[in-house]
Amino acid sequence: MAFHFRRLCFFSALLAVVLQLLHGVSGQLVVVEEPISAPPPPLVDLNTGDGIVPALFVFGDSLIDNGNNNNIPSFAKANYFPYGIDFNGGPTGRFCNGLTMVDGIAQLLGLPLIPAYSEATGDQVLRGVNYASAAAGILPDTGGNFVGRIPFDQQIHNFETTLDQVASKSGGAVAIADSVTRSLFFIGMGSNDYLNNYLMPNFPTRNQYNSQQFGDLLVQHYTDQLTRLYNLGGRKFVVAGLGRMGCIPSILAQGNDGKCSEEVNQLVLPFNTNVKTMISNLNQNLPDAKFIYLDIAHMFEDIVANQAAYGLTTMDKGCCGIGKNRGQITCLPFETPCPNRDQYVFWDAFHPTEKVNLIMAKKAFAGDRTVAYPINIQQLASLN
């Protein structure tokens, strides 16, 4: 289908204006208290015992952000109802109706839900920290259309700050090094480098690079960034590839035939291919490093092919959003979402529902080599 880049830019700008008006000149969102019915129990049972790894450190974007943008001047926020409608405690900043994929992974690892860097205090940091930030990318300029965000480089710097905090709590450098070496690092970056950089007409990158060159550029930066995390002590890394971005409601809304944009899907292929090669190279070149790749695109294809088996009925529109495919403007404050959220793949214009997040978490944790390569998260966590 033909993809209209100018429309994407227009709707992004329109969303920014709408959110600015909703937040008011003070920058504070005015909300009206209303009762929220108790959410159903999570699809993954929380194991409150000892985890099989000491901690989980999370880096990424809005797919796994859990509140780091709440208190920065940004249009990329989800700390308002109906976000969190199915989360115990309501909206937190997660871009979802409930749990994210890394929430499910944390539970499967036997860990508590990992706190956002902006809120982590005291002994909480000993079990892990989530540094992910909506609109963030591998490249520092990515997401500038949303103003505030925390790019990957800054997220790594924030991890360094956490290490300093942990040093005062766990017996010094030796104890830190041992704990960090045995901990898991989850990284999910890159989607905004396309959606909020390369595909935006007001960014120069599309005129500077073809799709292969841009994929090469991203992975060059990515390699350096992951090596920084390795040099800070990380050894067990889970790196998520990009999904079928041409099938998200925001992109579907730009076309006229209701089909996924193969132009966008093909655009991100060089990135995924390069990431797989990068992981192989890092495993070979960095002593004791153990990187694994999560094939998010393959997970999505399986969900689409077997939607009935998963209890899903709606693949082409968001549960909460405005306009065509409920994807032209993403979920706004106090908008009424669909009642049958467990039957939807997408919660809003860009992000999966809790149901799909937890399906993918289980696949990442215990799936075969078609979704987790060369081993899955459970196997990675169990390695000495």
Curated annotation (Swiss-Prot):
Pfam families: Lipase_GDSL (PF00657). The active site is at residues 62, 348, 351. PANTHER family: GDSL-LIKE LIPASE/ACYLHYDROLASE-RELATED (PTHR45650), OS05G0419800 PROTEIN (PTHR45650:SF22). It is found in: Secreted. The keyword Repressor does not apply. Its EC number is 3.1.1.-. It comes from Arabidopsis thaliana. GO terms for molecular function: hydrolase activity, acting on ester bonds. One of its GO terms (cellular component) is extracellular region. The keyword Translocase does not apply. This is GDSL esterase/lipase At1g71691. One of its GO terms (biological process) is lipid catabolic process. Keywords: Hydrolase, Lipid degradation, Lipid metabolism, Secreted, Signal. Gene3D superfamilies: SGNH hydrolase. Belongs to the 'GDSL' lipolytic enzyme family. Residues 1-27 form the signal peptide.
